C-alpha cells in the first residue's frame, strides 16, 4: 500500500519538485544566516514587516501564508531579540501593529548583505542564464 505522500507525489509531481526546491533554498538560507543567529523563517518575517513598514499580525499571516498561532510565537521571539515591536493599532483598539525596531532594520540589512547574490547563484549553479530566465518566466506564469 502506498503512503499518502507517495500518492500525492504521483498526482502532483510538479508540486513536490517546487517543495523540494523551496526546502533547499531554506536550508541554504539557514546556513548563510547562521553567523547572525537568525533563521530563514525569522528573516522572512522581518523582510515582510520591512516591506510594509507597519503591519497587523493578521495581514502578516496572509502575506506569509502561516498559522496565526505560529506567527504570534515567532513575533514573541523577534520582540525578545529586540528586532520587532508591537504598537497599539490606532484603527483597532484591540489590535496591534508590528514594526521593525532600529535593531531589526539593521539585522535585515546585514542579512541582505550576507546573502546577496550568493544564494541565487548557489540555487541556479547548474542552470544556464537562459534556463534561469525560462524557469523564472514559467514560475511567474504559474502564479496568479
Curated annotation (Swiss-Prot):
One of its GO terms (molecular function) is DNA binding. Residues 11-144 form the HTH marR-type domain. SUPFAM superfamilies: Winged helix' DNA-binding domain. InterPro entries: HTH_MarR-typ (IPR000835), MarR/SlyA-like (IPR039422), Tscrpt_reg_MarR-type_CS (IPR023187), WH-like_DNA-bd_sf (IPR036388), WH_DNA-bd_sf (IPR036390). Keywords: Antibiotic resistance, DNA-binding, Repressor, Transcription, Transcription regulation. It comes from the Bacteria. One of its GO terms (biological process) is negative regulation of DNA-templated transcription. It holds the Pfam family MarR. Gene3D superfamilies: Winged helix-like DNA-binding domain superfamily/Winged helix DNA-binding domain. Repressor of the marRAB operon which is involved in the activation of both antibiotic resistance and oxidative stress genes. Binds to the marO operator/promoter site. This is Multiple antibiotic resistance protein MarR. It comes from Escherichia coli (strain K12).
